[in-house]
Amino acid sequence: MVPRISEPQLRPEPHRAPSNSTKLSYTSYSSSFEADDERSSSADHDSMGPDIGSAHRDVPAQYAGEDTRLTSRKELSGWYAYGFAAEVFVICGIGSFIPITLEQLARENGVLLSDPTQPCGSSSTHLPPGLNPGNAKDSQCVIYIGGLQINTASFAMYSFSLSVLFQAILVVSISCAADHGNYRKRLLLFFAFAGSITTMLFLTVVPKVYLLGALWAIISNTCFGASFVLLNSFLPLLVRHHPKTQYGTPDFSPELHPSFVDEYPPEHSLGESEAEVYDERSALLSHNRTLSEAPDVTEPLPLSADSTSIELQLSTQISSTGIGIGYSAGLFLQCVSIIIIWLLKGTTFSLRLVLFFIGLWWFLFTIPAALWLRPRPGPPLPSTGNRNSKGSRSWLAYTIYAWSSLFRTVKLARRLKDITLFLAAWFLLSDAIATVSGTAVLYAKTQLRMAPEALGLINVIATTAGVLGAFSWAAISRALNLKPHQTILACICIFESIPLYGLLGFLPIVKRWNVIGLQQPWEMYPLGFIYGFVLGGLSSYCRSLFGELIPPGSEAAFYALYAITDKGSSVFGPAIVGAIVDGTGEIRPAFWFLAVLVGLPAPLIYFVNVERGKEEGARLAEIIEGFRIKDAEIASGEHSSTESISEDERGRDHREISPHDEEREGRRRNDI
């Protein structure tokens, strides 16, 4: 055993390249949740050189308690591990087996719509003589909840809508805690374990207590959405402190002894007062000022032209790798689930058992993330009055600040025509994506009488096509010389073919053929491929196009609005489809609504002008930055004469833009 060197020879820290999204500072205090990278094995050094993530760097702190140790390979592995753990829930759970299980549990408590005296039984059993899968209206099943007659397919759709509603509210409420204080990792683990345990609890749901299944679905989906928002909030920090970003070249990183950090006690805590009030982007974006008076004695390299591209490429690389790892886990577990269901003859117990394994997978592979991810605390919450008040750190303060930040961002977005058009289109498109998926699965189960293992195979095909589409649409766009918004329009047009194909089943001539128009189970497989292929293009190009329209310096706030629009929109589509099914007794009429929902975003996307949006965003960014600098100067002058400054005394919140001041600024620019 090699003895530990008590007095290591310290090497000087190498030059680092400054970056528009990076800032080095003191390390943070330790935490019980913190990854122990100080004594990593040599296995951790493969891809990033020496594991210098624990190296103390004697430079000014951006805010009290900041952890700016370099991102280590182990920390990246922890980030990937959670994607590997949780992605199976959305692919195998919400995307496939949870709606099937909810419908089946309700069906075993329901009666036939055509004959209320007859119990429904399983929807995957053989059809009565003379009844083909495409016109199985007489096999529709209903349950009664609180005196209301609800179709069993609608029951699953309503449950999903409620889960998305709670998810959207929770995501907004915790967004501030994700960026401020030391709650990011703790909340991630709380929601991860809560969601995985409730998913495992599906094993205990018997048909007599089928409503409990809806409760578990709502809780698990809400926890999943919240945990992924928290996981994504780690990405900018991992990129910011990555050696490739800090030292300006992909292959250069310093070599410091791993135990060096042990000799330096923490110098700040989150409870200390600050000389500067930070806005909601503090944890994700860089600032031009630091709190510490200690000078940065390192000699930076000249700022290279590709400094920003290094960060962008690294962020894309890490994100893409995480998505690939998550999809691989989802596909693997989906195949295992299909085998389990096939071996157990597609019983309700087999569905519950599969959901138990999905929750167990989520739980077990969250443990490496808990061990390897660092907390990476954000700046303390900006106080709104007495800076010594503990109320500024209370959960109520976090929640109020989160919602007020959202409203401020909405006010800014309303001033940008192209962002408004895009967000309206994305709201409809995101709702259409979620609603088409859930409707198709339930249509295949209730009207085409497809077995659960066959439904699982549809999801495998769609997921595989999604991966293929993510890579293929870039090549298609280059080959056809399409602009980003034109590529999105092409995806929408292909997407529209899915509900239109389902509507062909209403044509008398097609009905006589007994094929085409979703009258046979095998027709679901090519449609599943189309859905996945289109989704791969929409996901990447919509986010990319939106990024082009964001005012520089407001990326975090606007991407939060983008995510909330994505999460919140799916409340409406499934609920409307459920109401249509309850009113007509069939799912096929819902394809009329889906056709409209898929088509509505197209004209909005068509009128988005990227160049105009960039110009508007740049002008707004100048106005925002001008008022931030002015407020910073006022705060600096007043802070020198008094220890505590109230925002009310200053006259306005430094994060808000005065419409009158903006109007005067616009007139001044026009005069110039």
Swiss-Prot record:
<keyword id="KW-0472">Membrane</keyword>
<protein>
    <recommendedName>
        <fullName>Autophagy-related protein 22</fullName>
    </recommendedName>
</protein>
<feature type="transmembrane region" description="Helical">
    <location>
        <begin position="154"/>
        <end position="174"/>
    </location>
</feature>
<keyword id="KW-0926">Vacuole</keyword>
<feature type="compositionally biased region" description="Basic and acidic residues">
    <location>
        <begin position="38"/>
        <end position="59"/>
    </location>
</feature>
<feature type="transmembrane region" description="Helical">
    <location>
        <begin position="421"/>
        <end position="441"/>
    </location>
</feature>
<dbReference type="GO" id="GO:0006914">
    <property type="term" value="P:autophagy"/>
</dbReference>
<feature type="region of interest" description="Disordered">
    <location>
        <begin position="634"/>
        <end position="672"/>
    </location>
</feature>
<dbReference type="InterPro" id="IPR024671">
    <property type="entry name" value="Atg22-like"/>
</dbReference>
<feature type="transmembrane region" description="Helical">
    <location>
        <begin position="515"/>
        <end position="535"/>
    </location>
</feature>
<keyword id="KW-0072">Autophagy</keyword>
<dbReference type="InterPro" id="IPR036259">
    <property type="entry name" value="MFS_trans_sf"/>
</dbReference>
<comment type="function">
    <text>Vacuolar effluxer which mediate the efflux of amino acids resulting from autophagic degradation. The release of autophagic amino acids allows the maintenance of protein synthesis and viability during nitrogen starvation.</text>
</comment>
<comment type="similarity">
    <text>Belongs to the ATG22 family.</text>
</comment>
<feature type="transmembrane region" description="Helical">
    <location>
        <begin position="353"/>
        <end position="373"/>
    </location>
</feature>
<dbReference type="InterPro" id="IPR050495">
    <property type="entry name" value="ATG22/LtaA_families"/>
</dbReference>
<dbReference type="GO" id="GO:0032974">
    <property type="term" value="P:amino acid transmembrane export from vacuole"/>
</dbReference>
<feature type="glycosylation site" description="N-linked (GlcNAc...) asparagine">
    <location>
        <position position="20"/>
    </location>
</feature>
<feature type="transmembrane region" description="Helical">
    <location>
        <begin position="187"/>
        <end position="207"/>
    </location>
</feature>
<feature type="transmembrane region" description="Helical">
    <location>
        <begin position="545"/>
        <end position="565"/>
    </location>
</feature>
<feature type="transmembrane region" description="Helical">
    <location>
        <begin position="456"/>
        <end position="476"/>
    </location>
</feature>
<dbReference type="InterPro" id="IPR044738">
    <property type="entry name" value="Atg22"/>
</dbReference>
<feature type="compositionally biased region" description="Basic and acidic residues">
    <location>
        <begin position="647"/>
        <end position="672"/>
    </location>
</feature>
<feature type="transmembrane region" description="Helical">
    <location>
        <begin position="82"/>
        <end position="102"/>
    </location>
</feature>
<dbReference type="Pfam" id="PF11700">
    <property type="entry name" value="ATG22"/>
</dbReference>
<feature type="transmembrane region" description="Helical">
    <location>
        <begin position="490"/>
        <end position="510"/>
    </location>
</feature>
<keyword id="KW-1133">Transmembrane helix</keyword>
<feature type="transmembrane region" description="Helical">
    <location>
        <begin position="211"/>
        <end position="231"/>
    </location>
</feature>
<keyword id="KW-0325">Glycoprotein</keyword>
<keyword id="KW-0813">Transport</keyword>
<feature type="transmembrane region" description="Helical">
    <location>
        <begin position="590"/>
        <end position="610"/>
    </location>
</feature>
<feature type="compositionally biased region" description="Low complexity">
    <location>
        <begin position="19"/>
        <end position="32"/>
    </location>
</feature>
<feature type="region of interest" description="Disordered">
    <location>
        <begin position="1"/>
        <end position="66"/>
    </location>
</feature>
<feature type="glycosylation site" description="N-linked (GlcNAc...) asparagine">
    <location>
        <position position="288"/>
    </location>
</feature>
<feature type="transmembrane region" description="Helical">
    <location>
        <begin position="323"/>
        <end position="343"/>
    </location>
</feature>
<dbReference type="GO" id="GO:0005774">
    <property type="term" value="C:vacuolar membrane"/>
</dbReference>
<keyword id="KW-0029">Amino-acid transport</keyword>
<keyword id="KW-0812">Transmembrane</keyword>
